[in-house]
């Protein structure tokens, strides 16, 4: 994962270069390892690199051997080994997992993203046609923004974070996931079209527990593609604990197959998995896990149990309420949002990411996406029917790029730490989003708590020779929102502080430019003021989506799971 900035068809690109470098410097936190830039005709690409794969040779922008194609990527392409084999006639110049995008473009034109398995946001310049193509991964794990200026309407800008675009652009949009932009037509079109995207289509595929297990294991294995130390974010909840357990097993397997102590960094190695799904490299010989919370937080206690059970080298960090409050301005600056849920959950993740990076780790696995896929948020218990349950699930997955994916990407990349999310693997999504939603429904009378089928898939009861993935009390632990699990006093402290900072008079007088998007709580009002101080342009605010449960299901507007009625009913 890195940071990219691009300006296509700039009227004076060479004079603009110093400014482009300064704008890209605003996202150097995303790529502290190296900065690169290239100009071709009237287009400039700038890249801030975080080196994880192809460490010695993968600097960007990448240019084809004939100099006609220029590529800038923020992401990881997990099937790059297979893509290299498909493009054997192309002259590769690096070991980067991203370089195969160029020959895939030559082979498939704007359909190239369809063949990429990974998380990515990229721009590719074709000098022969004076054409730029930009694409974002299917779910929007990786951030990308697009901007235009009324003063220079022919110029198109792209950046990993919108703070790079605010100087030049009066129109900024979040680039839609699963889409590709082609300057030849000046249109953005969808390339990712799985059947489950149609929320009106209610699937009926029977449950296959072993298929779920094997698919998630493969998804984790793919994401251990790295030449640097990695770890897992471990909250002690179901999602992060499953990812940690699988990662510990896969790390042990990879360590046995490829002993890192014999790894020659100067030799030509391709990190990743082969056609048989076998992992060829291991960043560390043991898995390291990381947890954060207020002292004695529920997450910290659960994470200790999991780490001990799976044998990870565990690192526990605590923060005080004041440290969290002190970080809010930085969190909002990096996240570029005023959404209450995102800010609450991102602040501990932001603080933890700094600690992790200080320990020399560059990549972590994280558990985002499971709640959307399996209806794990506690308000899903109020779903009136399986059809409505599924429709809400699809909508939540579609909006992940504006919520949990944004949080996971920006709160970690603020410190040059890459977060990978196995639950959002393309194959895993295809499998799980096509399961009959009746199987996912929360049915207390039948003993089916939230994410029952995911828990059941990794329950080895009845498999006498199988090693358990998790302790039973963790596998069947009730859902906590991350911002709740780090300590209930975290949310209470935010609310109390907002009450003290925002007077009744202020709260009764929202800004006229907010229009109908008026904060309904003093906490939300406080965050919006902080956001506006950093990003006063309306076009920036228009990129923000507020995460709230479905009010028409009788749910409280406060997004904390603790305020959902179902939380009071501990389901056996």
Swiss-Prot record:
Keywords, comma-separated and alphabetical: Amino-acid biosynthesis, Asparagine biosynthesis, ATP-binding, Glutamine amidotransferase, Ligase, Nucleotide-binding, Phosphoprotein
Record-annotated Glutamine amidotransferase type-2 domain positions: 2-186
Molecular-function GO terms, alphabetical: asparagine synthase (glutamine-hydrolyzing) activity; ATP binding
Record domain Asparagine synthetase: where: 194-546
Binding site residues for ATP: 233, 292, 366-367
Active site per UniProt: 2
E.C. number: 6.3.5.4
Residues bearing the modification Phosphoserine: 265, 509
PANTHER family: ASPARAGINE SYNTHETASE, ASPARAGINE SYNTHETASE [GLUTAMINE-HYDROLYZING]
Listed name of the protein: Asparagine synthetase [glutamine-hydrolyzing] 1
Gene (UniProt): ASN1
């Amino acid at each position: 994962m890195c940071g990219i900035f691009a300006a296509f068809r700039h009227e004076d690109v060479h004079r603009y270069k110093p400014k482009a470098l300064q704008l890209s410097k605003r996202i150097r936190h995303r790529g502290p390892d190296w900065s690169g830039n290239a100009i071709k005709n009237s287009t400039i690409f700038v890249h801030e690199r975080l080196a994880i794969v192809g460490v010695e040779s993968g600097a960007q922008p990448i240019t084809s051997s004939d100099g006609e194609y220029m590529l800038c990527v923020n992401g990881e392409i997990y099937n790059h080994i297979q893509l290299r084999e498909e493009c054997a006639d192309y002259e590769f110049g690096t070991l980067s997992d991203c370089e195969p995008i160029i020959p895939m473009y030559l082979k498939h034109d704007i359909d190239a993203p369809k063949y990429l398995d990974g998380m990515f946001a990229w721009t590719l310049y074709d000098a022969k046609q004076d054409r730029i193509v930009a694409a974002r991964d299917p779910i929007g794990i990786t951030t990308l923004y697009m901007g235009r200026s009324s003063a220079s309407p022919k110029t198109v800008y792209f950046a990993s974070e919108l703070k790079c675009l605010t100087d030049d652009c009066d129109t900024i949009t979040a680039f839609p996931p699963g889409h590709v932009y082609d300057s030849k037509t000046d249109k953005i079109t969808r390339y990712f079209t799985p059947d489950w995207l149609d929320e009106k289509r209610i699937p009926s595929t029977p449950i296959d527990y072993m298929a779920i297990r094997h698919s998630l294991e493969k998804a984790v294995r793919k994401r251990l593609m790295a030449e640097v130390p990695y770890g897992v974010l471990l909250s002690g909840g179901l999602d992060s604990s499953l990812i940690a357990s699988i990662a510990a097993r896969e790390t042990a397997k990879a360590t046995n197959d490829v002993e890192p102590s014999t790894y020659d960094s100067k030799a030509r190695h391709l990190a990743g998995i082969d056609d048989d799904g076998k992992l060829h490299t291991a960043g560390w010989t043991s898995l390291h896990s990381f947890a954060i919370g207020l002292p004695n937080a529920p997450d910290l206690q659960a994470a200790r149990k999991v780490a001990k059970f799976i044998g990870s080298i565990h690192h526990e960090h605590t923060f005080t309420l004041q440290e969290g409050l002190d970080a809010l301005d930085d969190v909002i600056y990096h996240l570029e949002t005023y959404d209450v849920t995102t800010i609450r959950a991102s602040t501990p993740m932001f603080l933890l990411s700094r600690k992790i990076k200080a320990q020399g780790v560059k990549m972590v696995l994280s558990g985002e996406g499971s709640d959307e896929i399996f209806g794990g948020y506690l308000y899903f218990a109020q779903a009136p029917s399986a059809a409505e349950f599924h429709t809400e699930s699809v909508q939540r997955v579609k909006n992940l790029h504006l919520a949990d994916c944004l949080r996971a990407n920006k709160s970690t990349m603020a410190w040059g730490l890459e977060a990978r999310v196995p639950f959002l693997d393309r194959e895993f999504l295809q499998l799980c989003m096509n399961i009959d939603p009746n199987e996912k429904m929360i049915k207390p009378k039948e003993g089916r708590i939230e994410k029952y089928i995911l828990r059941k898939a990794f329950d080895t009861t009845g498999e006498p020779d199988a090693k358990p993935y998790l302790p039973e009390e963790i596998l069947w632990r009730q859902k906590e929102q991350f911002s709740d699990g780090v300590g209930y006093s975290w949310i209470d402290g935010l609310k109390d502080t907002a009450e003290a900072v925002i007077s009744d008079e202020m709260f009764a007088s929202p800004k006229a430019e907010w229009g109908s998007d008026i904060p309904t709580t003093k906490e939300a009002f406080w965050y919006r003021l902080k956001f506006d101080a950093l990003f006063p342009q309306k076009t920036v605010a228009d990129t923000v989506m507020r995460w709230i449960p479905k009010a028409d299901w009788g749910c409280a507007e406060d997004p904390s799971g603790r305020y959902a009625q179902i939380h009071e009913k501990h389901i056996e």
